Curated annotation (Swiss-Prot):
CC terms in the record's Gene Ontology section: cytosol
Enzyme Commission no: 2.4.2.4
Family, similarity comment: Belongs to the thymidine/pyrimidine-nucleoside phosphorylase family. Type 2 subfamily.
Keywords: Glycosyltransferase, Transferase
Domain of life of the organism encoding this protein: Bacteria
HAMAP family in the record: Thymid_phosp_2 (MF_00703)
Protein name in the entry: Putative thymidine phosphorylase
PANTHER family listed in its UniProt record: THYMIDINE PHOSPHORYLASE
GO molecular function: 1,4-alpha-oligoglucan phosphorylase activity; thymidine phosphorylase activity
Gene3D superfamilies listed in its UniProt record: 1.20.970.50, Nucleoside phosphorylase/phosphoribosyltransferase catalytic domain (3.40.1030.10), Pyrimidine nucleoside phosphorylase-like, C-terminal domain (3.90.1170.30)
Organism: Rhodopseudomonas palustris (strain BisB5)
Catalysis performed (reactions): thymidine + phosphate = 2-deoxy-alpha-D-ribose 1-phosphate + thymine
Biological process according to GO: pyrimidine nucleobase metabolic process; pyrimidine nucleoside metabolic process
InterPro entries found in the cross-reference section: Glycosyl_Trfase_fam3 (IPR000312), Glycosyl_Trfase_fam3_N_dom (IPR017459), Glycosyl_Trfase_fam3_N_dom_sf (IPR036320), Nuc_phospho_transferase (IPR035902), PYNP-like_C_sf (IPR036566), PYNP_C (IPR013102), Pyrmidine_PPase_CS (IPR017872), Thym_Pase_Put (IPR028579)
Length: 514
């Protein structure tokens, strides 16, 4: 870098209380002597340097001296945390050189197949925030056109290697994953304590919701801490045989979260990208046995058996290459599983099943038992075919509930507000008849409109499922919100399209709950 391009004089770091998501943002005053119009422009990429430490950031220019003085450089919260230098430190600023790995992205755009070294370079730069969202999008779109099996294997390996790689002494480390898309469906929080109660190791890391009303981490956070670091996670697993934590805090496949944040707005979800995302995290987690749940249904991610078969073979191919035994089960994805949709409501359902309460959702209980049965079959001390009976025994006896409480105590108490939303409205059946369809995507959107998952107590409580008979005006589900304006938005959305079909009628009336 030409020395004349460095900021002269150096600027001093100032921390700005500005959440810019995953983006590193640096703010400079328009009156700064370091600002050169021919070099620095708003939204350009810059390199911040202190000795040998370098951070890439997006530059923004302000006219507000109260925000940033002429001799200061403001760092957004993410940038300040990643740079990890104290306020007042002298920092130089220069235009950022484009990452060399962009040559590989250009080659991929032109239809070339990338080498493992090229893919590793791209993923390393993505994980270290050297790519803009536009550059990430270019890579993802070019890969969506065609990804060879060799490229897929290299992508999984690179994504797993760039972050934390967990290693366990146990020869059998079981794991479970659902590809998502079904409201509720909080089986993981029931399967983990059942499997751990059997004595199998199941260190479960889960994601937060991106487009759904709750992820497993969001729901578990109602009951316990989920933001454990690697050493804390290992202590919990050593004590309990399992855990239920947020994967983002232990840095498993960090590039995946960055790629997903760009994929979702573009509606990019190819089989190869899905497999790379899931398998990189399982490889990084040290899993040796993996059960994957494929819900199949008209509004699920997989709509047909043929789609499920192709995706299953892709998962098995990658698993075989990396020494992970992959088992795929297809399940009913026509409707939500359980009654609650949203963190607090889903946590209620989970604890009702674990506590063997008479009003516990039967579908959530049964699906959890069947999934747990598959994992228990990996226990060499259990007779073949005895998995389901043993899972049921562990649940019915209270052993699974006891194990869940041990995990909760080991992870630490929740600091979240676990109260149900104080504002509610019932969505009413549009006609007499039978519920003959539920749009999972629509129900998810309605629960998010009500405030979930950011507001833990927001969401939807289902009263009816497919096949249930209803009378006109009878409540079919209740919307909860913590803010009246969010409830009003959800009511308007439900009146336009409730997500329920009764005798092929979907418009519904909505009645506030006093």
């Amino acid at each position: 870098m030409n020395a004349s391009h460095l900021s002269r004089p150096p600027l001093t770091i100032r921390r700005i209380s500005l959440d810019t998501g995953r983006e590193n943002v640096a703010v400079i005053s328009r009156r700064s002597r370091a600002l050169r119009a021919d070099v620095f422009r708003g939204f350009s990429r810059v390199a911040l340097r202190i000795n040998t430490k370098v951070l890439l950031a997006t530059l923004m220019i302000t006219d507000d001296d109260a925000m940033i003085g002429p001799d200061e450089l403001g760092l957004s919260e993410p940038a300040f945390r990643r740079f990890n230098e104290p306020v007042g430190s002298a920092v130089s600023v220069s235009p950022a050189q484009p990452p060399a790995s962009l040559d590989a992205v250009r080659a991929k755009i032109q239809g070339h197949t990338l080498t493992p070294a090229e893919i590793t370079a791209v993923i390393d730069d993505v994980a270290h925030f050297r790519y803009s969202d536009m550059e990430i999008a270019a890579f993802l779109i070019s890969a969506a056109r065609f990804t060879s099996t060799d490229e897929l294997l290299a992508l999984v390996d690179a994504m797993a290697s760039v972050g934390t790689r967990l290693k366990w002494q146990n020869p059998i480390v079981v794991d479970k994953h659902c590809i998502g898309g079904i409201p509720g469906n909080r089986t993981t929080m029931i399967v983990v304590p059942i499997v751990a109660a059997q004595g199998l190791m199941i260190p479960k890391t889960s994601s937060r919701a991106i487009t759904s009303p709750a992820g497993t981490a969001d729901t578990m956070e109602v009951l316990a801490r989920v933001d454990l670091d690697v050493e804390q996670m290992k202590r919990v697993v050593t004590t309990c045989g399992g855990c239920l934590i947020w994967g983002g805090h232990v840095n498993l496949s960090p590039a995946d979260d960055i790629l997903i944040s760009v994929e979702r707005p573009l509606s990019l979800d190819t089989p190869e990208q899905m497999v790379a995302s899931i398998m990189s995290k399982k490889l990084a987690a040290g899993s040796t046995r993996l059960l994957i749940d494929f819900p199949v249904g008209p509004s699920a991610k997989i709509a047909s058996a043929s789609e499920a078969m192709r995706l299953r073979k892709l998962f098995e191919f990658v698993g075989d290459h990396f020494g992970i035994a992959v088992e795929v089960v297809t399940t009913d994805g026509r409707q939500p599983i359980g009654r609650g949709i949203g963190p607090v409501l889903e946590a209620r359902d989970v604890m009702a099943v674990l506590g063997n309460e008479p009003n516990a959702p039967a579908d959530l209980r049964e699906k959890s038992l069947r999934l747990a049965a598959h994992l228990l079959e990996y226990d060499p001390l259990l007779r073949g075919g005895a998995g389901y009976a043993r899972a049921k025994e562990l649940l019915d006896s209270g052993a699974a509930l006891k194990k869940m409480q041990q995990i909760i105590d080991a992870q630490g108490p929740s600091v979240c507000n676990s109260e149900l939303g104080s504002h509610a409205a019932d969505v009413l059946a549009p006609a007499d008849g039978v519920v003959n369809g539920i749009d999972c995507l629509r129900i998810n959107r309605l629960a998010r409109t009500a405030g979930a998952p950011i507001v833990k107590g927001a969401g939807i409580d289902l009263f009816k499922k497919i096949g249930d008979r209803v009378d006109q005006g009878e409540p079919i589900y209740r919307i909860y919100a913590s803010d009246r304006s969010e409830l009003d938005l959800a009511i308007a959305a439900a009146e336009a399209e409730s997500g329920f079909s009764v005798n092929h009628h979907s418009p519904a009336a909505v009645e506030p709950v006093s």
